[in-house]
Amino acid sequence: MSAIVDIIGREILDSRGNPTVECDVLLESGTMGRAAVPSGASTGSREAIELRDGEAGRYNGKGVLKAVEHINTEISEAIMGLDASEQAFLDKTLLELDGTDNKSRLGANAMLAVSMAVAKAAAEEAGLPLYRYFGGSGAMQLPVPMMNIVNGGAHANNSLDIQEFMIVPVSQPTFREALRCGAEVFHALKKILSDRGMSTAVGDEGGFAPNFGSNDECLSTILQAIEKAGYRAGEDVLLALDCAASEFYHDGKYQLAGEGLQLSSAEFTDYLSTLADKFPIVSIEDGMHESDWDGWKLLTDRLGKKVQLVGDDLFVTNTRILKEGIEKGIANSILIKINQIGTLTETFAAIEMAKRASYTAVISHRSGETEDSTIADIAVGLNAGQIKTGSLSRSDRISKYNQLLRIEEDLGDIASYPGKSAFYNLR
């Protein structure tokens, strides 16, 4: 039995300089697991609650000492002595202890830190790499990365309304080569922007954040960078967008301030369809407001056979909401953010539900990250097929890519890179 004998919660800083929660879990054998939780900038209204102190004079109210105290007191008391290898039972214990629908009492940040740290300790105790502990002998597929090379929206202080413009390397035989492709396109884009006298400063997720005149101009420039790096757009590298449409939906209209447009759901569907026709876009995330289910239905009916339509704010990694979306034919993919739901068990359940319905699952970081690379192990362990973890800069993003390189090396000849087949539900 891998009995838990000590739990330590602490307040650390994330990649934006805001407090977040870290947890150490010590087992009877002396084995330890450590985990840190991320935090989002654009968040869905139905996400599990991230507990903040609200004390204006300390970290502008963003401290997490209350969440840390919950770890060090009642959570510690509740799980001390439990078997760390019984993840589902441990997470159930956390859920019952919290007793709310949205984890608002203990805080999803406190609960997730403990859930992850326990899993890491149990994997170490078992002598298994974390991805293998999660997935067993069937874990052998590396994820296709969606690399956010231009940041807009809530992730950058520029004129772009769409939050993320991403490249997706698909023709490469290995993850290592896909990562190299992404890095080379990133540096080619930096040179193009520099030559134009445009900003090469980066946003929260490591992508560039220049002022483009339109989304169209931004996408065209990315195509130039792909070509400059020696790759073929539409063959070697595809494009993906995260609209984060909930952020610019006001008074029943999608208000693209950067382009001076106010569009209805039908008009915004037309807008996105035009972009998908003009550019090799394989995936669009949060193309409609999280509550605009009629708009989502329009978008899915229009593009759902040829473009991956990812629900992030729409589904918030929640099986109850995902089930409703599946039944209504809304979207065809779910973004998986571990801190949206708050425990590993619930996260894995969402991935499995998506797969059973032939929805793809994209494992994702948050804009406020740490050096914790657990999501890389989840992506491989659960054979998710896709990961979204930022650009090719900032060590908080690169840590996940580097972990995937290590995993691919560890897997050796049995490692596989799915490329275009990761989008298995598209025609």
Curated annotation (Swiss-Prot):
This is Enolase. It comes from Burkholderia multivorans (strain ATCC 17616 / 249). Its cofactor is Mg(2+). Catalyzes the reversible conversion of 2-phosphoglycerate (2-PG) into phosphoenolpyruvate (PEP). It is essential for the degradation of carbohydrates via glycolysis. NCBIfam families: eno (TIGR01060). The lineage of its organism: Bacteria, Pseudomonadati, Pseudomonadota, Betaproteobacteria, Burkholderiales. Gene3D superfamilies: Enolase-like C-terminal domain, Enolase-like, N-terminal domain. Binds a second Mg(2+) ion via substrate during catalysis. Its main location: cytoplasm. (2R)-2-phosphoglycerate binds at residues 163, 337, 366-367, 388. Its EC number is 4.2.1.11. Belongs to the enolase family.
